[in-house]
Amino acid sequence: MLVMSAKDICKSYGTDIIIEDVSFSVNKGDKVGIVGPNGAGKTTLLSIIAGENEPTSGDVFIRSGYVVGYLKQKDHFFSEGTVIEEAAKTFTHFYEMEEEISSLEKAISDTNNPKFDQDLEAYTHLMDEYKAMGGYSYKSELIGVLASMGFGADTHDKEISMLSGGEKTRLALACMMLQKPDILMLDEPTNHLDLKMLAW
């Protein structure tokens, strides 16, 4: 199944041609590498596919409903939080659901609640949705992905501002993996990964 394609992509700045007549197609499950020397336009091509840069000419097709994740070489974070806080942003919807669940639990614990039946039905529906979305497993998934990228429990409270460039790249990759985009594009992410991380 075709999930992404490009046809006759060109990009130029004035008289400087960066990319010329690039065409390709990617099917579901494909793993594709873009190979070329520095300055060949690899990053420019990725930014065009991600929708962050307009081609001078040509077309990019992304299958309807598909989410594209794009990990850049630099400028990963502007956050002043910690490692665990940044990674946990992926699961904001679960935290919101948990707050609503807690509120409904208080409501249905009061048998004199005039909206008891309505709140109970809402609670049951929300719990089913929470379970189906992975609410009981996301915390272990979060910890596991961070560990796979070299962030053990002792680093979770480390300020992002204190991370090295390589650590920021690894954290950005972990966050991207947690988001589970349909199409994942990585711009030289292996520069700061060891063999174990690459295998994972």
Question: Where on the chain are the PLM-derived regions?
Answer:
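ABC ATP-binding cassette signature C-motif
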Residues: 1-200
